[in-house]
Amino acid sequence: MLDSIVYFFNKSGFVTTLVLVWISLYLVMTLWVFLYKSIALKIELKREMQSLSNILNGAQDAPEHFMFNKKRNDETKRYSNELLQAWKHQVLKQSTTGLVVLSIISSTAPFIGLFGTVVEILEAFNNLGTLGQASFGVIAPIISKALIATAAGILAAIPAYSFYLILKRKVYDLSVYVQMQVDILSSKK
């Protein structure tokens, strides 16, 4: 199998090789972002669930976050709505970092693969025109080799889009817990 991969890259043009390396980097980035954000969001979601539970049980009067250190009006024992909204936006901004990478990969990888395919087919037609041979036995292997770049682009886009949707749902769940805390703390008088 390794021999066939080496043979493929030896027979491929520069653009196709560049496209396949680019798509491989996309795939590595997709896996890295997904694993990192999955772990980070799981920790953050657990923390906010516990914080909500503590606020409801009266064990704490604010989320455990640096923004709430000594920012309370001690006379009313309330936090300003602006501070609560700033905290919510900060948590959501932090939790969505990296999602744009998955979005970009899922939308551009198929086009990058298609670009590699088109360039490879153009090179093949150029070579066929030069050699003067245009039989099915000559054209079919060239086109099948060229389509590998498109397949690789689609292969990179599918997990990127799927992981994007999974992480987006986790961010939504986190936002619900954060909003519940904001609502509870805003209603305290």
Curated annotation (Swiss-Prot):
GO terms, biological process: protein import
Cellular-component GO terms for this entry: plasma membrane
InterPro entries xref list: Biopolymer_transpt_ExbB-like_1, ExbB/TolQ_transport, MotA_ExbB_proton_chnl
Lineage, top ranks: Bacteria, Pseudomonadati, Campylobacterota, Epsilonproteobacteria, Campylobacterales
Organism of provenance: Helicobacter pylori (strain ATCC 700392 / 26695)
Membrane association type: Multi-pass membrane protein
Subcellular location: Cell inner membrane
Disulfide cysteine pairs (residue numbers): none
Record-linked Pfam families: MotA_ExbB
Transmembrane stretches, start-end: 14-34, 99-119, 147-167
Designated name of the protein: Putative biopolymer transport protein ExbB-like 1
Family: Belongs to the ExbB/TolQ family.
Alphabetically ordered keywords of this record: Cell inner membrane, Cell membrane, Membrane, Protein transport, Transmembrane, Transmembrane helix, Transport
Keyword Disulfide bond appears in the UniProt entry: no
Chief location: membrane
